């Protein structure tokens, strides 16, 4: 007993007199507290936090140590209290942001979300109410004011740099080593990069930190020129193959679209998707495994276009925001150019989201038609463009070129966030959903996909009579960001990662139903068309989708993007295209002053057309596709007047062509 008393006395003395021990102990306790609070917000259940502790104790410790390490950085400043509270506030802010993100989608917050975030009024209006935004602004102002006061008033403490450095290095090394310890010790297998599974099994702090540093495809252990040649031997030997009459190929990526009839015991006032169900019965179809749930449109897009597996990249990574910012990548657009197809992208949303305006030239596309180049666009209740505008744009793209076309179309109408109360929800949930909020969201969603279903019927009616052979590939990019659990789905009809695809044609394309992953869809479509061109098209078509297939695909992907490009004989064979925006020229015919207003006349103007005078943007009023106007204040004879298409975030996309002789 005396020994225990002496030990406790010694420990107390260290705590009382040893500021070094107190500092690091405070960081550890702060990290433990932060981890419990952040996990509680993420899992919304204290018992679920303890399940993480019980099932993956090392993972729980890893999160605590990551937070402890970040807090330990405050010990290098005399104002350790201020910087400790500041660092803790940042982590709490991330936890709150994650809680908010999870209120309208399934996947947790990751570092890439800050790269793709667009804080314009259209974004705020969809995902946040005006009162909530005002409260957020007030909270941020109060927080900043509080931090300023704290900085002025917090006491100063001595800095023990050598000790603090040693402790921080030990903490950092522990954070790096723990994930690589044997799974039997309690961390578990963490080779996958899906943020949903990682956060669920290993915690938010670990997953978020990993998403900050984990990008690209890791070099395979056995990577070598010999290994790549062995994998690609049959691909390199196989000659390109295609029929003499290659059809138009249209991919139609349907935002958050799935057949709600897959929901168990849920009945609606009418079938929301009768035509889609008819297509599934009469056309080649199957389940389509998306790389994510409730979000991640760009990654589904990336997989279909490039035929690469995004899960081979970093944690939560969007290749659009990393490697494709600088590097061209082989794609179906590049491959089908060999067969003479012009390539287009059509999207009834802004051009700059996910940096598509930067990425698509590096994927080989010739044109990109976006919301900024469309007229007469109707919007739904929460502001997303309705998909029926796409019929006109698809027909226009087919008509504007003499050659056959590859058209990659991206819809947006059923996008979240879904309102709990809707003024436009015509389809009602009759049974199966008791929660009023989810029922209201489901009724809104069902109404939106019903309109999409009608758009699909209209589009196929138009394409049925098109004079050229045309193939239309329909699929949902991912499940909607609704609180749909596995228990609500008929799992015999696919899980949370599965939507469905259909291959329709006006030229009798047939084939057996087959389930695919997103990166296998293009090769599946081309196989039915007797087309075999391109590295990964051949690889997917020539290999059974089992065994070493996934590992070999990963090696090829690494070689093509990050390695020695052995498969391309050491060269980069793909050049960024000179992609144009829209399929029709926007022209300026004349500009003149009338009644103190500058009137600009031309062709193909849209509500996103902005008048520029000597390079300066003017507040512009859209009158029609033939005329735009602005105040003539300060405009003098000889000033250069032009019109540019400007995205919602202010990015200038293109400039009108001067055509003084236009009719």
Task: Give the role of each language-model region.
Residues 2-198, 637-640:
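Transmembrane and membrane-interface helices of multi-pass
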Residues 3-16, 20, 24, 132-145, ...:
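N-terminal leader/auxiliary helical segments
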Residues 111, 196-204, 294-295, 385:
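Membrane-interface micro-motifs in multi-pass membrane enzymes
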Residues 114-117, 201-206, 225, 273, ...:
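Alpha-helix initiation and N-capping motif
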Residues 120, 249-254:
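Residue-level preference for non-acidic, small/hydrophobic
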Residues 178-251:
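Membrane-interface segments at or immediately adjacent to transmembrane helices
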Residues 236-244, 254, 259-663:
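Solvent-exposed soluble domains appended to multi-pass membrane proteins
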């Amino acid at each position: 007993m005396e020994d225990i008393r002496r030990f406790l006395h010694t420990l107390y003395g260290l705590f009382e007199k040893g500021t070094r021990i107190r500092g690091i102990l405070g960081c550890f306790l702060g990290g433990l507290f932060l981890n419990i609070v952040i996990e509680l917000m993420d899992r919304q259940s204290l018992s679920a936090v303890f399940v993480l502790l019980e099932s993956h104790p090392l993972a729980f410790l890893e999160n605590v140590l990551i937070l402890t390490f970040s807090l330990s950085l405050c010990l290098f400043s005399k104002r350790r209290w201020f910087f400790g509270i500041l660092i803790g506030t940042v982590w709490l802010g991330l936890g709150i942001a994650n809680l908010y993100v999870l209120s309208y989608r399934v996947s947790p917050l990751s570092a890439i979300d800050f790269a793709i975030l667009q804080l314009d009024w259209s974004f705020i209006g969809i995902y946040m109410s005006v009162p909530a935004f005002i409260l957020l602004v007030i909270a941020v102002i109060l927080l900043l004011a509080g931090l300023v006061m704290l900085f002025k008033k917090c006491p100063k403490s001595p800095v023990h740099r050598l000790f603090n450095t040693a402790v921080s290095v030990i903490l950092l090394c522990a954070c790096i080593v723990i994930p690589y310890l044997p799974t039997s010790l309690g961390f578990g297998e963490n080779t996958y990069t899906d943020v949903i599974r990682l956060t669920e099994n290993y915690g938010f702090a670990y997953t978020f930190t990993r998403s900050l540093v984990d990008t690209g495809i890791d070099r395979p252990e056995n990577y070598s020129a010999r290994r790549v040649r062995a994998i690609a031997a049959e691909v390199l030997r196989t000659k390109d193959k295609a029929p003499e009459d290659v059809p138009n190929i249209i991919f139609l990526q349907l935002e958050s679209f799935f057949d709600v009839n897959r929901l168990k015991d849920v009945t609606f006032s009418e079938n929301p998707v009768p035509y889609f169900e008819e297509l599934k019965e009469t056309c080649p179809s199957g389940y389509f495994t998306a790389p994510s749930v409730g979000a991640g449109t760009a990654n589904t897009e990336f997989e279909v276009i490039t035929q690469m597996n995004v899960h081979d990249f970093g944690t939560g990574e969007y290749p659009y925001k990393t490697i494709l910012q600088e590097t061209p990548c082989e794609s179906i657009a590049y491959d089908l150019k060999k067969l003479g197809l012009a390539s287009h992208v059509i999207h009834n949303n802004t051009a700059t989201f996910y940096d598509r305006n930067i990425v698509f030239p590096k994927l080989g596309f010739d044109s990109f038609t976006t919301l900024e180049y469309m007229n007469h666009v109707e919007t739904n209740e929460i502001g997303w463009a309705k998909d029926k505008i796409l019929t006109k744009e698809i027909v226009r793209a087919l008509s504007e070129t003499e050659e056959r076309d590859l058209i990659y179309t991206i819809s947006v109408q059923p996008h979240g966030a879904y309102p709990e109360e809707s003024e436009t929800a015509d389809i009602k949930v009759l049974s199966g959903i008791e929660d009023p909020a989810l029922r209201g969201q489901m009724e809104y969603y069902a109404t939106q996909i019903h309109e999409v279903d009608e758009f699909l019927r209209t589009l196929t009616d138009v394409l049925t009579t098109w004079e050229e052979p045309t193939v239309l590939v329909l699929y949902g990019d991912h499940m909607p960001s609704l609180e749909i659990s596995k228990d609500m789905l008929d799992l015999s009809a696919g899980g949370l990662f599965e939507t469905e695809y259909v291959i329709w044609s006006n030229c009798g394309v047939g084939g057996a139903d087959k389930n695919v992953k997103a990166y296998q869809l293009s090769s599946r479509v081309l196989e039915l068309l007797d087309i075999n061109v391109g590295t990964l098209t051949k690889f997917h078509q020539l290999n059974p989708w089992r065994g070493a297939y996934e590992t070999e695909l990963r090696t090829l992907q690494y070689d093509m993007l990050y390695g020695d490009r052995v498969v391309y004989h050491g060269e980069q064979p793909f050049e960024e295209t000179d992609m144009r925006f829209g399929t029709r020229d926007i022209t300026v015919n004349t500009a003149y002053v009338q009644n103190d207003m500058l009137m600009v006349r031309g062709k193909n103007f849209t509500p996103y057309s902005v008048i520029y005078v000597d390079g300066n943007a003017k507040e512009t009023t859209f009158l029609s596709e033939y005329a735009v106007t602005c105040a003539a204040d300060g405009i003098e004879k000889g000033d250069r007047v032009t019109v540019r298409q400007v995205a919602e975030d202010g990015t200038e996309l293109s400039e009108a062509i001067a055509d003084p002789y236009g009719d």
